[in-house]
Amino acid sequence: MAGTARGCGTSLDLLRSLPRVSLANLKPSPNSRKRERRPRDRRRGRKCGRGHKGERQRGTRPRLGFEGGQTPFYIRIPKYGFNEGHSFRHQYQPLSLRRLQYLIDLGRVDPTQPIDLTQLVNGRGVTIQPLKRDYGVQLVEEGADTFQAKINIEVQLASELAIAAIEKNGGVVTTAFYDPRSLEILCKPIPFFLRGQPIPKRMLPPESLVPYYTDAKNRGYLADPAKFPEARLELAMKFGYVLPDITKDELFRMLSARKDPRQIFFGLAPGWVVNMADKKILKPTDENLLKYYSS
């Protein structure tokens, strides 16, 4: 009897020294948990999420688009070429006259200098991505009533009303084509100059765009310059405004500046190397190089 009392006292002393029993230190009895089955798909288990028997579990469901034997929808309806050649289409980022006037008012675009993609991209006016089939900027007529700047701008496409709004203020518009390599160099000139490579020739437009850029009505850079005065006068008569005489303007030299069809930058000819470290321009002297870059 005394031994039993001594054993109970020892057990109670042991319980007093042990940590208190709580939900945090409870453990299940050994072998009381049933082990979860994990065949193949560990997330689904057992039937792998396919359910019991039938067509869905055995994997014999019909293919996508099968309509039980009748002629499916995608064969009944004829095909139309709405998206034919979509991977080869050129994309042009829109630039409205309202946005252009906003950039000029903020001083992000200088109207006293010829404006091309270099100024527009550096002024954060547009974002051009040649790798995503962007081929430049399309000038749209939004904000034509409030546009007041006198500029010499070069874009890739321009609407008729946008051209009229600029020429009404005594400005000049030129539409020009740039191949992807020339476009990337024009948008990011500093990284190209740091590589120390000669400025390449600008490629001519593809056959499908030749009619557009050789038409004076579109102010194409390949059009006959002698036809421009007639086209400008015709557009002024159509929209009913007096065409200013830019030859008497004090900014005539800036307004008459145009690039050569093979030229990428204003004032820099193909074949020249811009040395950013020494701040010098290196020009080729070899006859073969001069003949190549001038052709």
From Swiss-Prot:
Protein origin, superkingdom: Eukaryota
Basic residues bias locations: 32-51
Subcellular localization(s) per the UniProt record: Mitochondrion
GO cellular component, one term: mitochondrion
Residues covered by region (Disordered): 21-67
Organelle targeting peptide span: 1-20
Key words of the record: Mitochondrion, Ribonucleoprotein, Ribosomal protein, Transit peptide
Main location: mitochondrion
Family: Belongs to the universal ribosomal protein uL15 family.
UniProt-recorded name of the protein: Large ribosomal subunit protein uL15m
Organism: Mus musculus (Mouse)
Gene this protein is translated from: Mrpl15
